[in-house]
Amino acid sequence: MSRYRGPRFKKIRRLGALPGLTNKRPRAGSDLRNQSRSGKRSQYRIRLEEKQKLRFHYGITERQLLKYVRIARKAKGSTGQVLLQLLEMRLDNILFRLGMAPTIPGARQLVNHRHILVNGRIVDIPSYRCKPQDTIMARDEQKSIALIQNSLDLSPREELPKHLTLNPFPYKGLVNQIIDSKWVGLKINELLVVEYYSRQT
């Protein structure tokens, strides 16, 4: 299944706020109306919708998400927590959380167009897994700096998660540590996602 490129508001109306996909918010009560129209949701549908929230928020394909679930299963610790850490430490998501891009698709464009340096080197892979002590900044080019400056000027001043630090001049981000689950940027029940895949395999 390919990456979603359809109407974004349609997704947030059904699944709730997906800040990585769009900074628009569903109208108050719209999700409740949708639920009442569709009647009682089955356990399968509840798990499916949690999985879809994860996919659309982080802007990944079904195949990519399944790959992350398999990696998380093999790691030490809670599979759900490890899964969220893997997704949160992607370069495109880190740029979004720093405010250097308005959405994760916007961050992916920055990376694909070679505007971003990690530890002084161009990285053009949005799924690049960031590590503690990685530094992330714009290339020393006017267009790259202008794109990030524009995003920072327009983004709401929200508290940065504790695993990140942003120096606004010269637009340099630092990964301090692996993210703690309470700082994940999405309201999600990751255990339902793990359950969804455990029943598919």
Curated annotation (Swiss-Prot):
It is found in: Plastid, Chloroplast. Its main location: plastid. Disulfide bonds: none annotated. Keywords: Chloroplast, Plastid, Ribonucleoprotein, Ribosomal protein, RNA-binding, rRNA-binding. The keyword Ribosomal protein applies. GO terms for biological process: ribosomal small subunit biogenesis; translation. One of its GO terms (cellular component) is small ribosomal subunit. Component of the chloroplast small ribosomal subunit (SSU). Mature 70S chloroplast ribosomes of higher plants consist of a small (30S) and a large (50S) subunit. The 30S small subunit contains 1 molecule of ribosomal RNA (16S rRNA) and 24 different proteins. The 50S large subunit contains 3 rRNA molecules (23S, 5S and 4.5S rRNA) and 33 different proteins. Component of the chloroplast ribosome (chloro-ribosome), a dedicated translation machinery responsible for the synthesis of chloroplast genome-encoded proteins, including proteins of the transcription and translation machinery and components of the photosynthetic apparatus. PANTHER family: 30S 40S RIBOSOMAL PROTEIN, SMALL RIBOSOMAL SUBUNIT PROTEIN US4M. Belongs to the universal ribosomal protein uS4 family. This is Small ribosomal subunit protein uS4c. It comes from Spinacia oleracea.
